[in-house]
Amino acid sequence: STPNCTEEELIAMNKLIAGIILTSQGISFVHAGEEMARTKEDEEGKLVENSFESSDKVNKIYWDRKVKYKDLFEYYKGLISLRKEYKAFRMNTNEEIKENIHFLKKGVNFSENNLVAYIIDAKNIDIKCEKIAVIINANNKDVDVELEESNWHVMVDEKTAGNEIIETIKDSKVNVSRKSIKVLIK
C-alpha cells in the first residue's frame, strides 16, 4: 500500500505501528511475521493483499527474515517486554483508562497535525513508575512536544525499545523523530 517507500521507511512505519499497538490499552494483536517484516508475494513477485486462499509458498513464514531484520525483531521484543513490565499499559476497566490517561493538546503542547501524545498517570496503577508519556509522530519530519514536566527517562525511540533507559531528558520539551513513537517514564 506504500509502493514508493524505501525499505528504511517501511521499517520505520512498521516500528511506529508496533509501538502504537503495544502501548495501547486493551489486548494487543500482532500478525505472525510482522516482527520480521513479513510480506506475502505470489509466484510473480506481486504483493498478495488477501492470502486466505493462496498457496503455502505465499503464506509460509520465511524464518531467514528473522536474521535479516534482527533489529526490527529486537524492537518488537523490547515493546512486548515494556508492556509486560508496566501495568499502566494494561488497565482493567474503561473507568480506569478514562481516569488515568490525559491527552496533550495541539496548540498547547505541540503544533503539528498527525501527532498523538498522552500521559498515563500511573502512580495509583503501577508501583514501578509515576507517569508514562507516549508520543506518536506520523509526520515526515521531527517534532517537538512540551510535556509540562521535566526529567523523563526515554524507554522507546525510533531505534530502540525495551526496559533499559536509553537517555534521560532533563527538559520538559521532547523531540520526536519523524514516523516514530517515543515512550518516556518518570
PLM region descriptions:
Residues 1-149:
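Loop/helix patches that line or flank the sugar-binding groove of alpha-linked glycan CAZymes
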Residues 2-8, 162-173:
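Short, polar loop/linker segments at the starts of domains and inter-domain junctions
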Residues 57-60, 89, 160-164, 182-183:
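Short, surface-exposed, polar/charged, turn-prone segments marking secondary-structure boundaries
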Residues 98, 156-157, 170:
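Intrinsic disorder/low-complexity signal
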Residues 137-138, 158, 186:
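Residues immediately flanking
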Residues 149-162:
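Solvent-exposed beta-hairpin/edge-strand motifs
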Residues 167-186:
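C-terminal beta-strand-rich structural cap/linker in extracellular carbohydrate-active enzymes
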